[in-house]
């Protein structure tokens, strides 16, 4: 397990609003212990998760979001 900005399949962040419970819910649904809305340089507001399982993608630096 590891902490990180949870990633959608195309290496895109899950955008969020500071103070909302959306990230905590998303992270727990994906098997993490929780999360919050953080700021990822170059990506903007993004969900940060704690203790995500290794099979859940996190943002890889240097690879652009490609939808």
From Swiss-Prot:
UniProt GO cellular component terms: extracellular region
GO molecular function terms attached to this record: sodium channel inhibitor activity; toxin activity
Subcellular location: Secreted
SS bonds (residue pairs): 12-65, 16-37, 23-47, 27-49
Residues the record lists as Threonine amide modifications: 67
The keyword Methyltransferase is assigned to this record: no
A family per Pfam: Toxin_3
LCN-type CS-alpha/beta domain residues: 2-66
UniProt keyword annotation of Cell membrane present: no
Keywords annotated in UniProt: Amidation, Disulfide bond, Ion channel impairing toxin, Neurotoxin, Secreted, Toxin, Voltage-gated sodium channel impairing toxin
GO biological process: defense response
Expression tissues: Expressed by the venom gland.
Domain free text: Has the structural arrangement of an alpha-helix connected to antiparallel beta-sheets by disulfide bonds (CS-alpha/beta).
Family note: Belongs to the long (4 C-C) scorpion toxin superfamily. Sodium channel inhibitor family. Alpha subfamily.
The protein's role, per its UniProt record: Alpha toxins bind voltage-independently at site-3 of sodium channels (Nav) and inhibit the inactivation of the activated channels, thereby blocking neuronal transmission. Is highly toxic to insects (tested on the crickets A.domesticus). This peptide may also be toxic to mammals, since it is similar to alpha-like toxins that are active on both insect and mammalian sodium channels.
Protein name: Toxin Bl-1
């Amino acid at each position: 397990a590891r902490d990180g900005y949870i990633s959608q399949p195309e290496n895109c962040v899950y955008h969020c609003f500071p103070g909302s419970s959306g990230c905590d819910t998303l992270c727990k649904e994906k098997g993490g212990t929780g999360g919050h809305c953080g700021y990822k340089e170059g990506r903007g507001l993004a969900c940060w998760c704690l203790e995500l399982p290794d099979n859940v993608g996190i943002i890889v630096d240097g690879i652009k979001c490609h939808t």
